[in-house]
Regions:
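N-terminal secretory/targeting leader peptides
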Residues: 2-5, 9-19, 24, 30-128, ...
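A gly/proline- and charged-residue-enriched helix-loop-helix capping module
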Residues: 130-134
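Glycine-centered hinge/linker elements that transmit conformational signals in sensory
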Residues: 143-144
Length: 343
């Protein structure tokens, strides 16, 4: 069952997040632990603000891991992409310049194309189905394939269902004709928007506001949270519920860093990382509620789209991803089993 975070718990975790935000520079060592030894600093790259559910989960993890290791490890989170965009950050993870980072699923997909199945267009009917799959370990075999690239996927976070926002209502595929829509740098998502009737344009998130203002593109696709955080309602005030993706981000860790831990510490690290997934799922619900309230205040028009019309357009893409390998077919089939249990 999906866990809900109450207001008291949310504020407590936010307090931990604020404490983590005040952590100092990029050195590999910091204050001393309970045994008098210098603490090892785990540096985490993150491209969203401190109020984001993923930040809250990371801060909660950091507090618990520091306590479990008696201060031998401390977590420092660097939000708002201050350490760079997600592509360069991934290379920093691989080389060991960073220990942890939150990246979109398109990053591991660039190393193993089978990752595309986890966030394939219209694979899920709702966010809860993806969360159930994550809890049941459906994606774990895929996560185990990145070791050879010197990073490990240590947990999964939701970044919510994604929808299209533009300067007009989008209710059916025909409404997107000729509309250039920003997507993550992924061939899959470019194809998806093309099939939905528009033109997919890969672009960094920080470029979207100016690109819409200058009529380089007509809009983007994302969750209510990101739409609000980047104030895209100012330049694209129609938010259309196409529900084309249920997106996930992953926390990736440098493999050498993990291998250098003693076995007990590594086990604790992985356990607490998995538990942070539930913190993030619950905090995400709160993020969505808060974002919608702000968007209402700014006069955003929410539009109900014909989801089945868009889904039908994207089915060939979904099936091509599902049939890519035995591993992708297994993930697809297990998600269908979850859907059947809900029916």
């Amino acid at each position: 069952m999906k866990k809900k975070i109450n207001r008291r718990t949310f504020l407590k975790v936010m307090g931990a997040a604020a404490l983590a935000a005040s952590a100092g520079g990029l050195s590999g060592c910091g204050s001393t632990g309970e045994n008098g030894e210098e603490s090892t600093i785990i540096r985490v790259a993150f491209n969203q603000p401190e109020t984001h559910a993923e930040y809250i989960a990371l801060a909660d993890f950091g507090e618990k891991f520091a306590a479990a290791t008696h201060g031998r490890y401390q977590v420092e989170i660097y939000p708002n992409a201050v350490l760079g965009d997600q592509g360069p950050v991934t290379e920093m993870i691989r080389t060991g310049a960073l220990q942890l980072a939150v990246v979109p699923m398109s990053v591991p997909e660039s190393y193993n194309s089978d990752f595309a199945i986890i966030a394939a267009p219209y694979l899920y009917d709702n966010l809860e189905q993806m969360e159930t799959a994550a809890r049941e370990g459906v994606f774990d075999p895929l996560f185990a394939t990145t070791d050879k690239f010197n990073f490990e996927v240590v947990t999964l976070y939701t970044s919510g269902a994604r929808h299209i926002y533009t300067n007009k209502p989008i209710t059916k595929p025909e409404d997107l004709k000729g509309y250039k829509i920003r997507v993550q740098d992924s061939d899959t998502y470019i194809q998806m928007i093309n099939l939905m009737g528009g033109v997919g344009i890969a672009m960094g998130q920080s470029e979207v506001y100016a690109a819409v203002q200058q009529h380089v593109i007509e809009g983007g696709e994302n969750s209510e949270v990101v739409y609000n955080n980047f104030k895209h309602y100012e330049i694209a005030p129609y938010f259309s519920y196409t529900n084309h993706l249920v997106m996930t981000d992953v926390v990736v860790a440098n493999k050498d860093f993990l291998d250098d831990m003693d076995e007990d510490t590594r086990t604790t690290f992985r356990k607490l990382m998995k538990e942070s997934m539930e913190v993030e799922f619950a905090a995400w619900d709160q993020n969505i509620e808060d974002a919608k309230a702000v968007l209402d205040e700014h006069g955003v028009t929410f539009v109900e789209a014909d989801i089945e019309a868009f889904r039908e357009r994207c089915m060939p893409l979904l099936q091509s991803i599902a049939n890519r390998s035995d591993m992708t077919r297994e993930v697809y089939d297990k998600v269908q089993e979850i859907k059947a249990r809900e029916a």
